[in-house]
Amino acid sequence: MARSVVLVDCHWHLTASEFDHDIGSVLEDAKTIGLCALVAVAEHSGEFEKVIELSRRNAGLVFPCLGVHPVQGSATGPQRSATLQDVEDALPMIEQYRDELVAIGEVGLDFTPRIACTDDQKEEQRNVHSRSAGRPTINLLRDQGAEKVLLHAFDGKPSVAMEGVKAGFYFSIPPSIIRSEQQKLVKQLPLENMCLETDSPALGPEKQVRNEPKNILHSAEYIARVKGISLEEVIEITTKNALKVFPRLCHVLPK
């Protein structure tokens, strides 16, 4: 692969416990395959400090997003729907670190307007979870006047995704696409609306095996095969798309 080719992982979970013992080697492996920017998302305010701390420690490679996932829970307790209190707890910290963030995320259907809904925030970049809620999520974002939107690991119908394309939204494709029922999505989406992600440690090429950012090449290779174009072209265009979604990444990429 040419040295000038660079990759962006638009969505992964840096603070997941699965990475606690070897995060350094995970990041080194990511750099080895050409990843130059990894967008790390948070799901609740309890993760915010760790996301910020690790992004500062790995400045120039890891870039933070802070948000409230629509499903809250832990390994020791049951899952529950996020509440407005979760959002209220998160907002002061999001504001505190706003200058360091590349986007708001991970957010979902119920709370995207609450976190970014004013006229001044319409251009706020958003990293969005829309599982089982593709059409209402797209409609809501469009009604809010959102402009820079990434819908990660979209699981809706391709026809619904095309409504997002018409609104100018982007869709990131994880490595699990090689074994996914969503392969029709890749066939129909224009490459100009695609980005790459891993959603590590989930959505890897193999079930029940920890996913890592280095596996992002599985996404790119699959897209190249389906579209009948070179891997280099897929990487070049998806990276350009990532810079449109996350303009703050522009200055860190090789010229």
UniProtKB/Swiss-Prot annotation:
Cofactor dependence: Mn(2+); Ca(2+); Mg(2+); Zn(2+)
Database matches in InterPro entries: Metal_Hydrolase (IPR032466), TatD-like (IPR001130)
GO MF annotation list: metal ion binding; nuclease activity
Signal peptide residues on this chain, from the entry's feature table: none
Residues that, per the record, bind Zn(2+) 1: 11, 13, 106, 199
Membrane-spanning segments: none
Annotated EC: 3.1.21.-
GO cellular component terms, semicolon-separated: nucleus
Activity regulation info: The 3'-exonuclease activity is sensitive to the metal ion present in the active site, whereas the AP endodeoxyribonuclease activity is observed in a variety of divalent metal cofactors. 3'-exoxonuclease activity is suppressed in the presence of Ca(2+), Zn(2+) and Ni(2+).
Protein residues bound to Zn(2+) 2: 106, 129, 152
UniProt subcellular location: Nucleus
PANTHER family: DEOXYRIBONUCLEASE TATDN3-RELATED, HYDROLASE OF PHP SUPERFAMILY-RELATED PROTEIN
Family that this chain belongs to: Belongs to the metallo-dependent hydrolases superfamily. TatD-type hydrolase family.
Protein name: Putative deoxyribonuclease tatdn3-B
